[in-house]
Each structure stands twice: as structure tokens, then as C-alpha cells.
């Protein structure tokens, strides 16, 4: 019954169509490729040249390097997860309503903490900047597509029945209620 209420709601149908169109668009394809490419690039750097770069740093800067690399990895994994969910919508492996679930939403990121970029490896700082930019774009898509998920239309018949029930419980239909008070 609940599915019938959702499917009859034009606003909800329009929302589902908009999400499906985005998931099937060239824009999404480019975003997906960019996101997955950045994930691969970050993994390659952090598992290879990044290890060498971090060993060249003093202890304090090595900790900053580790923190920044964890943030890059976290941002990219969250963005990649969101992109994979959208691809599942496109491939019809997941319903739009399921993709709209809160567990798939992205959180707004806080302000970045200050880092002396002049002493950190340029490749790491490039990954930091690009992962932030990608996450911000994906977050905006997430917010635009899912933040105002239409609710099922109000059922006016049920609303009227509820009003009648409340009135009856309050004695509105009892002709003798005037003398009982």
C-alpha cells in the first residue's frame, strides 16, 4: 500500500526521474571516471612514492603527512561509495528510494586545518586539493538530488477520517452531550 502511495505522487515520480537521469548522464560518467581515477592515483602514490616522501620528513611532519593521507583516503572512499551507489541506480541494481536513504548521504566537511604546504610533498598536497574539490562536488550533487526527497502526498480521505474520529471521541456526535455536561 505504501508503495502505491509513493508511485501515485507526481513530485516523487519527478524526483525519481531526475535522480535516474543524473545517474545515466555523461556528467555522471565523467564524475565517476574522475573519482575512480583519483582513488587509483592516491592509492598508487600513498603505497609507493608517498612512503618514500614521508620517510624524508621529520617526525612531526611525518605525522602531518599521515593525517593528511588518511583524510585524502577517507574523502575519496566516501565519494567513491556515493558514486558506486549512483551507478547501482543506473544499472537498476538499487532503487532510487534506497539510494536516497540517509546511510548513503555525504556529510558536509569542516574547514581544513592549516598545513605549511611549503614543507609537504607537492604530490600529497595536490591529492589533498583535488580530493577536497571532488568531495565538494559530489556533496553538492548529493545535496541537490537527495536533500529534499519528496514525501508521499497527504491522503485527504485519511485526514478527514482522522478528524471525524477525533470529533467523535470528543462527543461531537452525541446528541445528549449538551445535557451531560
Give a label for each model feature.
Residues 2-181:
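Surface-exposed peri-terminal alpha-helical interaction modules
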Amino acid at each position: 500500500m505504501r508503495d502505491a502511495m509513493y508511485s501515485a505522487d507526481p513530485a516523487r515520480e519527478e524526483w525519481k526521474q531526475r535522480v535516474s537521469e543524473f545517474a545515466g548522464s555523461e556528467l555522471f560518467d565523467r564524475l565517476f571516471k574522475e573519482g575512480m581515477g583519483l582513488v587509483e592515483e592516491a592509492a598508487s602514490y600513498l603505497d609507493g612514492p608517498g612512503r618514500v616522501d614521508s620517510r624524508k620528513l621529520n617526525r612531526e611532519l611525518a605525522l602531518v603527512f599521515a593525517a593528511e593521507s588518511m583524510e585524502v583516503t577517507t574523502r575519496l572512499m566516501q565519494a567513491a561509495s556515493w558514486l558506486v551507489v549512483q551507478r547501482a541506480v543506473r544499472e537498476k541494481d538499487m532503487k532510487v528510494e534506497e539510494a536516497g536513504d540517509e546511510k548513503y548521504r555525504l556529510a558536509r566537511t569542516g574547514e581544513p586545518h592549516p598545513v605549511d604546504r611549503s614543507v609537504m610533498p607537492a604530490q600529497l598536497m595536490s591529492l589533498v586539493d583535488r580530493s577536497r574539490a571532488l568531495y565538494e562536488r559530489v556533496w553538492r550533487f548529493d545535496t541537490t538530488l537527495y536533500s529534499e526527497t519528496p514525501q508521499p502526498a497527504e491522503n485527504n480521505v485519511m485526514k478527514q477520517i482522522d478528524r471525524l474520529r477525533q470529533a467523535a471521541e470528543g462527543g461531537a456526535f452525541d446528541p445528549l452531550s449538551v445535557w451531560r455536561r
